[in-house]
Curated annotation (Swiss-Prot):
Membrane topology note: Multi-pass membrane protein
Subcellular location: Cell membrane
Single GO BP term: transmembrane transport
Family of this protein: Belongs to the binding-protein-dependent transport system permease family. CysTW subfamily.
Natural source organism: Mycoplasma pneumoniae (strain ATCC 29342 / M129 / Subtype 1)
CC terms in the record's Gene Ontology section: plasma membrane
Function: Required for the activity of the bacterial transport system of putrescine and spermidine.
Residues spanning the membrane: 15-35, 78-98, 113-133, 145-165, 191-211, 244-264
CDD domains xrefs: TM_PBP2
Protein name: Spermidine/putrescine transport system permease protein PotC homolog
Annotated gene: potC
Length: 286
């Protein structure tokens, strides 16, 4: 009996370790390869021996990053991502408010459509958007570019934000809103003092997801981008090997992501400790 339990625990632990390895091993390889230097053509060098004994003649991938002509695609991606966030999040919040006050059948229908949009393949969404722009935007002798990219990103980002914000809004105690209005607060003041602080964690999560999805998107962007270049389109345009600067840029993004996760974890820990201290003070005062 004891051996059977030990075997089950070992299998569970092994499965957990295998999953972690499959998730994080590619990221570790990217970080290691970024220190290998680069070839004469600026491509990556897949020789892990160079990590411990780097070739002094090999140019660092991070130096290639400074020489690469990706500043404009990076700026374009950041601008597109920020505008997408600025437009998508308010639309999702207003939609969530409308769903909260709507009838149940309409509520389920709209939320189901949002979930269906998330399950739709990107290539289908991209083709449908191209057909839409071909019969509207292009018919006015306008070109594919920033407008079509941003419009497309907003169209697939709003469902992400809605799915993250609406479940949190459903749990909001409406008595708090009624009490705020009884105290003389206007609906706008109630929103900023009651609703917004309550929804803030979900809104921040939605902002991160929307920006990351917009920044990373290639399939839809490639169909509606016209002559505008983004980081994703630049990375997918490689034909003769992966450039070293791309690996260096990926390593920087990995480190930034790790730092962001650590900051969020630290913030949650500090909030938890603060609540514990308040509880102790209340217990002592009572």
């Amino acid at each position: 009996m004891f051996k059977m339990k030990s075997c089950k625990l070992w299998l569970r632990g092994s499965f957990f370790v295998i999953v972690l390895v499959l998730i994080y091993l590619p990221l570790i390889i990217v970080v290691l390869v970024s220190f290998n230097g680069s070839s004469t053509r600026g491509n990556i060098v897949l020789d892990f021996g160079n990590v411990l004994n780097p070739n002094p003649d090999a140019k660092s991938a991070y130096l290639r990053l400074g020489e690469a002509d990706f500043a404009i695609p990076l700026l374009n991606s950041v601008i597109i991502g920020l505008i997408t966030v600025i437009v998508s999040i308010p639309i999702a919040i207003m939609t969530a408010f409308a769903l909260l006050r709507s009838r149940q059948w309409l509520n389920k229908t709209v939320f189901g459509i949002a979930n269906f949009s998330l399950a739709t393949p990107d290539i289908i969404t991209g083709i449908s958007l191209v057909l839409l722009f071909a019969n509207t935007w292009l018919s006015f002798n306008q070109q594919l570019g920033f407008f079509t990219i941003i419009s497309s990103h907003i169209s697939f980002s709003v469902p992400y934000a809605l799915v993250l914000i609406y479940p949190k809004m459903q749990k909001l105690n409406r008595n708090l809103i009624l009490a705020s209005q009884d105290l003389g607060y206007s609906p706008i003041a109630t929103f900023f003092h009651i609703t917004l602080p309550y929804l803030l964690p979900s809104i921040l999560s939605a902002i991160l997801v929307v920006f990351a999805t917009s920044f990373d998107d290639y399939v839809i962007t490639s169909l509606v981008q016209g002559s505008v270049k983004t980081v994703a389109s630049e990375l997918y345009s490689f034909r003769k090997g992966i450039k070293a600067w791309a690996i260096a840029f990926g390593t920087i993004l990995i480190l930034v992501s790790i730092l962001a996760v650590l900051l969020v974890t630290l913030h949650k820990y500090l909030r938890f400790k603060h609540k514990e201290m308040l509880r102790v003070k209340q217990w002592k005062n009572s």
